[in-house]
Regions:
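Flexible, acidic/Gly-rich N-terminal and inter-domain linker regions that tether
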Residues: 2-96, 475, 483-484, 491-521, ...
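A glycine-rich phosphate-binding loop feature that marks nucleotide/adenosyl-phosphate handling sites
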Residues: 60-61, 241-248, 362-367, 402-418
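Conserved AdoMet/S-adenosylmethionine-binding subsite of the radical SAM
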Residues: 123, 146-398
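Long, highly charged, low-complexity intrinsically disordered interaction regions
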Residues: 372-440, 481-503, 507-508
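Short Fe-S-cluster ligation motifs
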Residues: 127-141
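Short, charged beta->alpha transition segments
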Residues: 89-91, 120-131, 312-313
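Canonical Radical SAM [4Fe-4S] cluster-binding loop centered on the CxxxCxxC motif
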Residues: 91-120
Length: 533
């Protein structure tokens, strides 16, 4: 038997001796009631509501004698009609669950088909699908089987087998279970490329109402430990403690990843050391306080964690969780505003250095008086606007407090968030494109990072005109209201919020604005749709 597997077995047995799980929950992980194909159909379908999976962010190439690679450009994705990613083998290890979260289809009280994969079955499926070029990697999540520690043991055993016995060198994203031990969290970080812990809801009140078995502290605690461990491992191999961001961020002094913003965030955090009250005015302050109260500024300290890492991973040739960590929030299950969601998002990026925050429009599945009624259309357009706002935070130098406020807590869904912001700050427009700096250009609707870079480069060598701006990628149907080129507007239009709003809505008006959600269903394409199963 492989030395790593022997080590894992010893650790697992030691942890099981400490494990206090509900012995009345008699669930056999081998579950002989279903074939592997039937389990795949059940558990792939059960995983479709988890959207927190994208490309790897890793640069690990293929190796002789090993299977797969995690090169960033090699993780290619197909998307279903509703935007769900289907290129990873996205499955649950089990949909048995000891928790009774009201929003979840797999909640304990639901009468649904239950199945559980063994680690070997998951490995076989991953390798066989990869060899057939159906998938590019594995996204593994799970319900709570017996208890968090037992569940994480089985998930880590699966990853260990993939990395050692099957020599799988491809991309792996694991959804960790809050409440599992630090030992298992450490081993998951060495074995997977990306780790995520779902925040689920942006407030403690929302969690208490819909997920009584979960607390914000138990979710943020592993998130903070993973962040600290990633930072220490990055520094150990000569990199910055912070995750790599878009190169354009170095020109955005007001962005959430700028040195000034990081110092301000640290200053706010330190200012709370003598203040035991959690501010109710800002979700960012709430997350800062949780980070301090739960002692999150410490790396995972299990000295034997490297023993679970396959070969070269244990010698710091590869960062701990090289693709970083992510999380997911449900949109529309509770009454939080866009402002609360965006403030929470910014706090997660700054306080926990998350690589991505994902949003999932809630699809009513369960009958409960605190949830939207079954048949209520999911807020897909709101989800889309939040993703656009998320990009403004990560790539355009905006802060959450600029985009929304307590006085205006929600986006105008009829126009994109950047236009919404510009219309509330018309005193800053029009912008002269031949003189404005990169950061100012990025705040103009219709101008993105690439076109802003092209503008700043091209104007060194000559004058610009609207034809050249169009060739550079500027979306003039939105931008022309907010810019001048050579002191002239493209059309003579009044700089008035009501007029521009009407024009933008008419320009961008498509069928989605008049969608009538009648007899519609929202489903994710599965592997069976492609004739895989």
């Amino acid at each position: 038997m492989n030395d790593h597997i022997q080590t894992f077995v010893r650790k697992t047995l030691a942890l099981q001796n400490k494990c206090l799980y509900n012995k009345n929950m008699n669930t056999d992980i081998r579950n002989s009631n279903y074939t592997t194909q039937e389990k795949l159909q059940i558990l792939a379908d059960a995983a479709k509501y988890d959207v927190a999976c994208t490309s790897s962010g890793s640069s690990r190439r293929e190796k002789k004698g090993e299977l797969g690679n995690a090169e960033a450009c090699g993780i290619c994705h197909s998307f279903a009609a509703d935007g769900r990613c289907i290129s990873l083998l996205k499955i649950l290890m089990t949909n048995h669950c000891a928790y009774d979260c009201k929003y979840c289809i797999n909640r304990k009280s639901n009468d649904v088909k239950r199945a559980t994969f063994t680690p070997e079955e998951i490995c076989d499926l991953t390798v066989e699908f990869y060899k057939r070029n159906y998938i590019e990697g594995l996204f593994l999540s799970s319900g709570i089987l017996k208890n968090p520690t037992y569940t994480m043991e089985k998930m880590c055993e699966t990853l260990l087998l993939l990395r050692t016995k099957y020599h799988f060198n491809g991309y792996i994203h694991i959804k960790t279970i809050p409440g599992a031990s630090d030992e298992l969290l450490a081993s998951a970080g060495y074995l997977a490329d990306r780790i995520s812990v779902n925040l689920e809801l942006p407030t403690e009140e929302g969690l208490h109402m819909l997920a009584p078995n979960k607390t914000m502290k138990n979710i943020l605690n592993p998130m903070g430990k993973v962040q600290s461990t990633i930072a220490s491992h990055r520094m150990a191999i000569g990199k910055s403690a912070y995750m790599d961001r878009s190169g354009g961020n170095k020109f955005l002094n007001a962005g959430i990843f700028s040195d000034a913003s990081k110092k301000h965030f640290s200053k706010c955090l330190n200012a709370q050391k003598n203040d035991t009250a959690v501010s109710q005015d800002s979700q960012m302050n709430q997350l800062e306080s949780y980070k301090r109260y739960t002692s999150l500024d410490h790396a995972l300290t299990w000295e034997n964690a490297n023993q679970l890492a396959p070969r070269d991973m244990s010698q710091l040739k590869r960062s701990f969780a090289p693709a970083g960590q992510s999380t997911q929030m449900i949109i529309g299950a509770t009454g939080e505003s866009d402002y609360t969601l965006l403030q929470t998002t910014q706090a997660l990026y700054q306080g926990f250095d998350l690589k991505r925050v994902f949003y999932s429009a809630y699809i009513p599945l369960n009958e409960d008086n605190v949830l939207p009624e079954i048949g209520t259309p999911p807020p897909l357009l709101r989800e889309h606007r939040l993703y656009q706002a998320d990009w403004l935070l990560r790539f355009y130098g905006f802060q959450a407090g600029e985009l929304l406020s307590l006085e205006q807590p929600n986006f105008n869904e009829m126009i994109d968030p950047k236009c919404d912001w510009a219309l509330r700050h018309l005193e800053q427009f029009p912008v002269e494109v031949e003189k404005a700096n990169y950061a100012t250009l990025l705040r103009v609707p219709g101008i993105g990072p690439k076109s802003a870079s092209r503008i700043t480069y091209a104007r060194r060598y000559g004058r610009l005109d609207y034809d050249s701006l169009k060739k550079m990628g500027v979306v003039l149907k939105r931008a022309h209201y907010f810019i001048t080129c050579g002191g002239k507007q493209l059309y003579h239009t009044p700089i008035e919020a009501s007029y521009i709003t009407r024009q933008l809505i008419n320009v961008d008006k498509k069928d989605i604005w008049n969608t009538q959600h009648v007899n519609e269903s929202f489903t994710q394409m599965t592997l069976t749709d492609f004739g895989v199963c």
